A protein has these predicted regions:
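Intracellular juxtamembrane helix-capping segments at the cytosolic ends
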Residues: 1-5, 192-205
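Helix-loop-helix hairpin linking two adjacent transmembrane segments in secondary transporters
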Residues: 7-66
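Interfacial helix-cap and linker-helix signal at transmembrane-aqueous boundaries
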Residues: 30-39, 113-114, 146-147, 232-240
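Multi-pass alpha-helical transporter architecture, strongest
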Residues: 56-65, 248-270
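Juxtamembrane intracellular "pre-TM" segments in multi-pass secondary transporters
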Residues: 66-91
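Extracytoplasmic gate region of multi-pass secondary transporters
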Residues: 85-130, 134-138
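C-terminal transmembrane helical hairpin of 12-TM major facilitator-type secondary transporters
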Residues: 150-197
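A late C-terminal transmembrane helix in Major Facilitator Superfamily
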Residues: 206-238
Length: 270
């Protein structure tokens, strides 16, 4: 996406990532309908049906033209150069926190809805993960439309603050309904984090190349795994109190704000 000849790459990056959210919504909705009609016992059949998606993606990807990230005559940064660059490590921290902030709530949203509201898994999936994904996609679509009028740094900082508020709402509110609203609000707040960090990386390290984006994606995936793991670990220590587990996850949006501020300072003195 960063190599495409578009005028505003930040908007394009946000629009691209919004389709991940719409895919998320589709998977939750169709899977919920499958379980509603055929029961959870047949989950293996559903897994086989979903295999069609990556197979089709693989075929389509073979036909996608990919423009080079580095212009002709220039050389990208080596892995060694990246590892010596302070800005790169700040970006890695931001990506890890972006993934963790998103998945720490998303992965537990269905369970939280079932336990907090006492509803069935069907309602829990629709009220939890699907509402989270809809609002996350809406945030990305919003930035893709109005991104040229919005300062990305301020938008990411405001989103991180909103994420902190949503975590507090989920974990401290005495009302299960307000806690569930906090889950949805979290989806809205994390929308810009992942694509925004990619865009900031492209602007900060113009010769980062494919290696940089691959490592940033790896950091994001580590966060996607580490966030829910931390929540689950703390929940177990707190006698299966999921609210306390999610409260521990507030560390990630706080660190993301630290990363955004540190990146601005590092670029100023670079």
């Amino acid at each position: 996406m960063e190599s495409c000849p578009s005028e505003n790459k930040e908007k394009a990056m946000s629009l691209l990532h919004s389709f991940y959210c719409w895919g998320h919504v589709g998977v939750v909705l169709l899977s919920t309908l499958f379980f509603w009609f055929f029961g959870i016992a047949d989950w293996k059949i559903l897994a086989l049906l979903w295999v069609i998606i990556p197979v089709c993606n693989g075929i389509l990807f073979c036909k996608v033209p990919i423009a080079p990230l580095i212009e002709e005559g220039e050389t990208g940064m080596s892995l060694r150069e990246l590892c010596k660059n302070r800005i790169f490590w700040i970006l890695m921290l931001m990506m890890m926190c972006a993934g963790a902030s998103e998945q720490a709530v998303s992965q537990w949203a269905s369970t939280f809805a079932e336990q907090g509201l006492g509803v069935s898994k069907t309602i829990g999936d629709l009220a939890g993960p699907m509402s989270f994904a809809i609002l996350m996609g809406s945030a990305r679509a919003f930035y893709s439309k109005f991104g040229d009028r919005i300062d990305l740094d301020k938008f990411m900082q405001a989103s991180s603050l909103l994420c902190i508020v949503s975590y507090l709402c989920i974990s401290l509110s005495p009302s299960p309904l307000f806690s569930l609203i906090g889950c949805s609000l979290c989806g809205l707040s994390v929308g810009i984090m992942w694509p925004g960090t990619f865009s900031k990386a492209s602007a900060a390290l113009r010769n980062g190349g494919t290696a940089m984006f691959a490592l940033l994606a790896l950091a994001g995936d580590v966060g996607c795994s580490g966030g829910p793991t931390l929540v689950g670990f703390v929940t177990g220590l707190a006698s299966d109190d999921l609210k306390k587990g999610i409260l521990a996850g507030i560390l990630f949006p706080i660190l993301l704000i630290v990363g955004i501020v540190s990146l601005k300072k590092a670029k100023r003195y670079a």
